[in-house]
Design a protein with these regions (language model features):
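Bacterial N-terminal signal peptides that target proteins for export
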Residues: 1-9
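Bacterial N-terminal signal peptides
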Residues: 10-18
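Boundary at the C-terminal end of the N-terminal hydrophobic targeting segment
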Residues: 21-24
């Protein structure tokens, strides 16, 4: 009985050790791949509560982003590195937010993502997705996921200003395409 117990303990110990080594190796591979990325371009699906929106998006590290939504409001989201602007062209209206108080401050800051991956363990390591979780000083809870096979950035999950779950899924990702900084310029309302 004691021999079986010792054997069981040894098997469990080596299994846990193997999982930790495997996770560390996976994290190193994700970090290596992400370090090479300068820009991302992709289609997306964004689900907020029960509402789903689609569009295309461009990210240039650090902190630049432009997403064009395919909807009746002709919504565009732009981060110029300091400010996030939600533009509703149909209504000729722009809403401004300081980037530092939004989850985009982490998502668009590659160094923050690299540190998150380096210094934390995945909260989920499934068949298709590897997920890391980040909590910041503003109480933003952010889950970032990567494809387990390609190790590419697959999206994120967070909460919006109204505490609705936001799931942002990346589709057809392309990396390191040339994107000019002026593409991320926020227009003036009178120019809409």
């Amino acid at each position: 009985m004691i021999k079986k117990l010792k054997l069981t303990f040894i098997i469990i110990f080596f299994y846990l050790l193997l999982i930790n080594v495997s996770n560390a190796n996976l994290q190193e591979k994700i970090i290596s791949k992400l370090q090479q990325v300068k820009t991302l371009s992709f289609n997306f699906t964004q689900k907020i509560a029960e509402k789903e929106e689609k569009g295309n998006c461009y990210i240039k590290y650090p902190l630049l982003m432009r997403c064009n939504y395919q909807n009746a409001k002709q919504k565009i989201l732009i981060s110029n590195g300091k400010t996030v602007a939600v533009i509703k062209k149909k209504y000729k209206k722009i809403y401004y937010y300081p980037i530092k108080i939004t989850p985009l401050f982490t998502i668009l800051n590659k160094e923050k993502i690299l540190n998150l991956i380096k210094f934390s363990k995945p909260i989920k390591n499934g068949l298709k997705v590897i997920m890391f979780e980040f909590n910041d000083k503003q109480s933003n809870n952010l889950k970032i996921f990567f494809d387990k096979n390609s190790l590419e950035f697959k999206g994120w999950e967070t909460k919006d200003a109204y505490s609705n779950n936001v799931i942002f899924t990346i589709i057809d990702l392309k990396t390191n395409k040339t994107i000019q900084d002026k593409f991320f310029k926020i227009p003036k309302e009178e120019d809409l």
